[in-house]
Amino acid sequence: MTEAEAEVKASARPKNPVTVIGISGPSSSGKTTLARLLQRIFSHISENLQTFIMHEDDFYLPDDRIPYTTTSSGKTVQDWDTVEAIDVPFMASALSYVRQHGRLPPRLKSKEDLNEASDSGVSDETIAQLQRQVSEKLQQVGPVLVGDGEKRTVVFFEGFLLFSPPEAEVREHVLRPVHEQIDVRLFLPAPYDYVKNRRERRSGYVTIGPAPVPPLPHRGSSASDDVKQHVDLEAEDDAPPQNFWTDPPGYVDDIVWPRYVRDHAWLLLPESGLDNDRYQNARNSDIDELVRIVGQGTNVRTDAGVAVAPGKGALPMADVLKWAIEEVMKPLEMAER
């Protein structure tokens, strides 16, 4: 490539481009851990590369607006694992703001780091080695990210409900405005037994707290609202003081796992050897049958526009991290060519 061609190519790049990496999967599958590891890897590569994390948990509705549901055993509990508990319009607007400005909106103050952080399972030596490998690879691809040039932003956006089915299969979906703003979609499957064990060992979660009275008109709306409310993203966060949620007994089997299977029925496949026709029928009606057919929930489609982590949830986090780095590198390498 001549110097003139390189200048033309550089001028064609978007100013301060933003790449959003979506990381999703069931509860306790390692989403937050992976996001933090990727942040550590990529945040020290170059002054021209800015990185930060977004957490879907920061978009929960206030505690007193979380919907209630009645379980099969007759218990009435709050359902924190449904899309109706998430302020989807606020989440989509915040994501749009990030893509436009390359930073989090002032309104968004994260509470996720107040939750307990578990050991990542990846040594400092491995992280340092991966940092060197990423830096060397980017140097081979082009000078923009490692030398003088325009800044690029990479956002690691993690959450349990980020993706939507292919538009050819489901024309309208509540998460489509979020899904379409994510450039790289990573999915971490995890078996039911693992999810249940990890989730039930957690002490609980920091929550947003109850809504102010009267409710503020610009801080959120439920996913089912007919009219999308305006969200002033430049305003300071006016969320109330945090509360703390602890799962009641049986919450994984009553709420967490059935909701995960229901909301990802478009992505999950029947457990090996089970009837696919029965699965397709159950997707539209019987959640108990759907959960039974999915089994451990580690068979996942690879043709739905989502990159699925190898190993069906059984690989060490170090191996998942290496896979994720390769996926993150793809758009960065393409941008430099």
Predicted features, each with a name:
Residues 206-279:
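Acidic, metal/cofactor-coordinating or nucleic-acid-engaging core segments within structured domains
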Residues 2-12, 41, 202-205, 251-337:
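NTP-dependent small-molecule kinase module
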Residues 52-55, 59-124:
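Conserved nucleotide-sensing/catalytic segment adjacent to the nucleotide-binding pocket
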Residues 110-150, 163-166, 171, 175, ...:
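Conformational switch/transducer regions in large eukaryotic molecular machines and scaffolds
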Residues 31:
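Conserved lysine of the Walker
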Residues 1-22, 26, 37, 43-52:
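Extreme N-terminal, non-catalytic leader segments
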Residues 131-212:
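ATP-dependent NMP and nucleoside kinases share a basic, alpha-helical "lid"
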Residues 10-17, 128-153, 229-246, 250, ...:
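Intrinsically disordered, low-complexity acidic Ser/Thr-rich regulatory segments
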